[in-house]
Amino acid sequence: MGVSAVLLPLYLLAGVTSGLAVPASRNQSTCDTVDQGYQCFSETSHLWGQYAPFFSLANESAISPDVPAGCRVTFAQVLSRHGARYPTESKGKKYSALIEEIQQNVTTFDGKYAFLKTYNYSLGADDLTPFGEQELVNSGIKFYQRYESLTRNIIPFIRSSGSSRVIASGEKFIEGFQSTKLKDPRAQPGQSSPKIDVVISEASSSNNTLDPGTCTVFEDSELADTVEANFTATFAPSIRQRLENDLSGVTLTDTEVTYLMDMCSFDTISTSTVDTKLSPFCDLFTHDEWIHYDYLQSLKKYYGHGAGNPLGPTQGVGYANELIARLTHSPVHDDTSSNHTLDSNPATFPLNSTLYADFSHDNGIISILFALGLYNGTKPLSTTTVENITQTDGFSSAWTVPFASRLYVEMMQCQAEQEPLVRVLVNDRVVPLHGCPIDALGRCTRDSFVRGLSFARSGGDWAECSA
């Protein structure tokens, strides 16, 4: 099985190692900030599933996300999704063709549909939008400030999955991190900027814990597609009928209804007015329809890469075992998606650091969240009826893997506690751990946390990948 990685030379990151200050944000809007993320038009934008921009869940956390009094963080790990992007090339072609079809067949564009008559699909493909770049700058700033007792004196070890938008996200994170450090009078002087230390290939034959792709049975699964089609059929037909009535001359499919809903997010995050103006696509749908759309995205993630798929959590086992190695300063023990060449080399997988940052995609992160058992309290999601966030025990695609999402794993030493404690935050929401005895703040001792990851330590169900 092939393995591949690229060690990035410093000159490739010259733009983020030169000590330049962070460029002024596209906006200084109070609804889009470093601490709270994207709170603009939240009644709609927070219902875009994985196409939602990062928004902080600190106010949704039953446990304060602040570092508890009497404790000091001794280890911090962030796992981040890339920032807001343009549609993928394949989806973009479908969106463009649909809009062209509407324009060619509809005779009258009235009211809220008027914009469609002259709308020109000109979005990019695959890469980060300027807004998405700023999301990661902000993420780097926030990470530095949150863990400043460590970041002032330590250079984080950084890995990225091999997609260009993921690498660019890591670079923008570094930009925010380093510019904040340079302005901190208490930071250790003379330290070099962080860099992306390892890029892991996304080739289909490569072992990659950030973006697994070598479990054949899992890759061939069509479960999520079936669930998606069935749930779409519960809410899209009524929307389709309304659109066809209002846009006389066009015939749509249920899937094309969801494409038009996708355009609400993509058209919004691709503009310079992202903080002041929603795309006109958004107004074509009601609040209840957005609730259904958001739940559809959650179903796709849960049954595609989460516990709803028999091999979903197993895809995250390799990363979970790497996390165990980092927390315990011991070699990686894993025979699933880990890259033995990289993980056995201190240059590409050091065990003596206390600050780590990894960058990846939404699907891989979903599997990792479930491999860590963070949503063991989530019962199988209904495939016919919308369930609210309480019923799903805090799981939704928008709450877990929006653009620029971030998982923080913290280890802390606290007064009157001999053993270090571990806790996890997902987008600033403390997620009480499962599989180990937790305290009132959702934490476990490090050793009990590791013992609780027995699913990962035993390799999950990887043996079934080639069944």
Swiss-Prot record:
The active site is at residue 82. The keyword Hydrolase applies. It is an enzyme of class 3 (hydrolase). Residues 1-23 form the signal peptide. Its EC number is 3.1.3.-, 3.1.3.8. Its main location: secreted. It comes from the Eukaryota. 1D-myo-inositol hexakisphosphate binds at residues 50-51, 81-82, 85, 88, 165, 301, 361-362. One of its GO terms (molecular function) is acid phosphatase activity. Glycans are attached at residues 27, 59, 105, 120, 207, 230, 339, 352, 376, 388. The keyword Signal applies. InterPro entries: Acid_Pase_AS (IPR033379), His_Pase_clade-2 (IPR000560), His_PPase_superfam (IPR029033), Histidine_acid_Pase_euk (IPR016274). It catalyses: 1D-myo-inositol hexakisphosphate + H2O = 1D-myo-inositol 1,2,4,5,6-pentakisphosphate + phosphate; 1D-myo-inositol 1,2,4,5,6-pentakisphosphate + H2O = 1D-myo-inositol 1,2,5,6-tetrakisphosphate + phosphate; 1D-myo-inositol 1,2,5,6-tetrakisphosphate + H2O = 1D-myo-inositol 1,2,6-trisphosphate + phosphate; 1D-myo-inositol 1,2,6-trisphosphate + H2O = 1D-myo-inositol 1,2-bisphosphate + phosphate. Phytic acid is the major storage form of phosphorus in plant seeds and, thus, in seed-based animal feed. Phytases are therefore of considerable economic interest. PANTHER family: 3-PHYTASE B, MULTIPLE INOSITOL POLYPHOSPHATE PHOSPHATASE-RELATED. Monomer. This is Phytase A.
